[in-house]
């Protein structure tokens, strides 16, 4: 209150906001800052910084993969030995770093996340009944967190309609013998303007552990590169937010317009004693394909070169890992395509040279990347606002199965393989965004992947617009079904019928499968 009285006294009526000199005398600025900094506590010991986290606490962990994770604070939780934690995280990283450390020490009861990635330990604990796993679409997770921070108890979203997210029944906990103990609950559904939406509730936490780049001595925080991700919304959504940073600077170092998290959201700050900043998938421009990689497979290259024809000048597009990302290598230099990454980048560039590698700049596949001139970074809640709001013209992704009416399944094989839906459910939920699937026509065991009805849990219902395989290209009509529009020269219509487990029409203008030319 003393600070407010000073402000009221020192700001005369009618003073222009554009006056070049400060509104307060320097001595009053110093006094105001001194008064304000008392509400943000600074620590030197990570264990003391997480004081109050107890058995059964709900803890949000910022970061995406290994980028922007609060590694010192996670280590402090390990040291404290608190158990039965409910962890909210975008994904679970790797076995021996970040959240994986807490999983290995059996300190976590439940994980709420969107993607397991390559964390084999988490998948093993889950399938063995030692860990509860609440899989949530990444954009929905970001919005549930953001909603809590803004005082909104619930909201409606189109993401997940027609899937296990809406219907319930997604496995949360298995028994050691493999039978299901806990399943997800169905969502309330409501229709708005002819579309169906799910009711999702805000998610709160006792603590949020955040990784920033720098903080000033009043608690304002800034980030580097794509490390904003889930850190920004999480910092606003917990009862107590603890931010570890690489550097603490004097007040006034940051221009007011450059501050990413105002100190009103910050309770505790610590300068991390050390940072490993491990990179999950180090990828450089001159990286060679790993042994056994399919990158040079002729069939795969055929899909890539066909997929590249879907890009248009001025387009905003999101590309899944694998074939979709590789298709971007064939974008004509005469064309500008703005590539979006769910973790908070618009304007993805090529993979970096070895001397350009930056642990704070990764894509949604956790690969090191660069950003083109004019590109930008933002938090995960903003990223999915772009996606859900229909601001992308194209999303291209892989699939395990696609139905004849455009249903998509690509995130789970019940009881066997659990990777998570990541941002895929959000990406296919906007009616304004064209969805292109790139995949091999059949499985490794020669089973068709294009079916009358998907047998695996759906990612989206009637959402796919085009299917590209090494054999053919299908256009998808969500009410009439598939039409074969292009055919690879080594295939025949009879061959496609034999390897496709549903009926389809053949275009009267059927043509050879198109391929982008390198000089295009």
From Swiss-Prot:
Residues 1-39 form a transit peptide. Its main location: mitochondrion. Residues 280-299 are annotated as: Disordered. GO terms for cellular component: mitochondrion; motile cilium. It is found in: Mitochondrion. InterPro entries: 3-oxoacid_CoA-transf_A (IPR012792), 3-oxoacid_CoA-transf_B (IPR012791), 3-oxoacid_CoA-transferase (IPR014388), CoA_trans_fam_I (IPR004165), CoA_transf_AS (IPR004164), CoA_transf_BS (IPR004163), NagB/RpiA_transferase-like (IPR037171). The keyword Mitochondrion applies. Key enzyme for ketone body catabolism. Transfers the CoA moiety from succinate to acetoacetate. Formation of the enzyme-CoA intermediate proceeds via an unstable anhydride species formed between the carboxylate groups of the enzyme and substrate. Probably play and important roles in the energy metabolism of spermatozoa. Belongs to the 3-oxoacid CoA-transferase family. Homodimer. This is Succinyl-CoA:3-ketoacid coenzyme A transferase 2B, mitochondrial. The gene is Oxct2b.
